[in-house]
Regions:
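Alpha-helical membrane insertion/targeting regions
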Residues: 1-150
Length: 150
């Protein structure tokens, strides 16, 4: 894998994270979305924030977990960040599953976002259960899938 490609994922994750943080932390809720979604955001602010901020934390933490030097030299920190990441996935996934019913775009959109939330939680569970059983390669593969969903 080229150095450019390897750096593209963390850089884009950080920029997306900075943008999302700015929009949801400093702007009026719903200002950056379609007017119909703005009403949904305002009707369910707690669910939106329980989805956005844990998901944002996961998005920002994820790339560091894939850095081989970090994983091998800072094992304790890798494990701690991994637990925080998976907790964020769980909270973001549950709130995302709840919010899927209010998504913009009809039934297909509702089902797509619900499936995304279920797969996000499922792959996080599989990654965690793999590492608990010392299946490091399986854990790594499940985490790649999980972060791709992130």
């Amino acid at each position: 894998m080229s150095k450019i490609y390897k750096s593209l994922i963390p850089i884009s994750s950080i920029f997306i994270g900075i943008y999302a943080f700015g929009v949801y932390a400093f702007l009026e809720l719903g200002v950056a979305v379609h007017p119909i979604m703005k009403a949904n955001f305002r009707a369910h602010p707690a669910a939106i924030y329980f989805h956005i901020f844990p998901s944002l934390i996961a998005l920002l933490l994820g790339p560091f977990q894939f850095n081989e030097k970090f994983r091998t030299t800072k094992t304790h920190l890798h494990r701690l960040i991994g637990k925080v990441y998976l907790l964020c996935i769980l909270v973001g996934g549950i709130s995302g599953l709840y919010m899927a019913q209010f998504s913009f775009g009809g039934t297909i959109s509702h089902l797509g976002f619900a499936l995304l939330a279920v797969l996000w939680i499922f792959t996080g569970y599989k990654a965690y259960s793999s590492i608990i059983r010392k299946m490091i390669v399986a854990h790594y593969h499940w985490m790649i899938i999980n972060f791709a969903l992130t």
